[in-house]
A protein has these predicted regions:
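Cytosolic-facing regulatory segments adjacent to core modules
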Residues: 3-94
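Conserved nucleotide-binding/hydrolysis micro-motifs of P-loop NTPases
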Residues: 22-26, 75-78, 103-106, 146, ...
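Short glycine/proline- and charge-enriched loop/turn segments
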Residues: 36-40, 113-120, 160-165
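Helical mechanochemical/support elements of P-loop NTPase systems and associated helical scaffolds
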Residues: 24-28, 49, 53-56, 78-82, ...
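Phosphate-binding/switch loop-helix module in NTP-utilizing enzymes
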Residues: 69-141
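Generic hydrophobic alpha-helical scaffold/packing signal
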Residues: 17, 29, 33, 83-90, ...
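Switch/connector loops and helix/strand junctions flanking conserved nucleotide-binding motifs
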Residues: 24-30, 38-39, 106-111, 155-160
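Phosphate-binding/switch region of NTP-binding enzymes
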Residues: 1, 7, 11, 126-179
Length: 179
């Protein structure tokens, strides 16, 4: 990326997986189109284009269509579901880069952990930490890059020195961050 010229085509496209956990495929596609075309999402949704926006959106759609980009939708997921989707896409598409949106609990994770722990209830921070560990383990096992995110608690608005204490649910997630 060049700040003066924007994205520069290098001719190299790496297989990439995007795992969405809260948004439908249609929402993700619209956001991708908006980002790549630099056209407001509402203009795309309602078809109200100005100047060359429609042409840019069509070009963005072509770029996305020609890209080795794969999207998996996991609205209610377990740790095993996430791992299975990652392994499937490594096997079928040789993905090297994975974006997981985002680290949070789900009913299926709670059920999975409860079964594995013999019914012992774990706190949310422990479960979130386990998910971050699993993602990091997959990076190391398969030699892939995984990026994820998590939410911040309400203290972020007043914090002068952002740190792991602002992570909602589990500041222990920060223990597994590499960047």
């Amino acid at each position: 990326f060049d700040p003066n010229f924007g994205w520069i085509k290098t001719g190299v496209a790496q297989p990439t997986l995007f795992i969405t956990t809260e948004q439908e495929l249609e929402e993700i596609q619209t956001m991708m189109l908006a980002f790549i075309s630099n056209v407001d999402e509402d203009h795309i949704i309602y078809g109200n284009y100005v100047q060359d926006e429609e042409e840019r959106v069509l070009e963005a759609a072509k770029i996305i269509g020609d890209s080795p980009l794969y999207v998996e939708v996991l609205p209610d997921f377990s740790l095993q579901d996430v791992e299975d989707k990652i392994k499937k896409n490594i096997r079928e598409h040789d993905v090297k880069y994975i974006f997981h949106d985002y680290i949070h609990t789900s009913l299926k994770i709670l059920e999975e952990i409860s079964k594995k722990s013999g019914g012992i209830k774990l706190r949310e921070d422990n479960i979130l930490f386990m998910l971050s560990i699993r993602l990091k383990d997959l990076c190391n096992k398969y030699g892939v890059f995984i990026m994820s995110a998590t939410q911040l608690n309400s203290d972020y608005q007043d914090s002068e020195t952002p740190d792991q204490n602002l992570l909602r649910g589990a500041k222990s997630i920060a223990d597994k961050i590499d960047y």
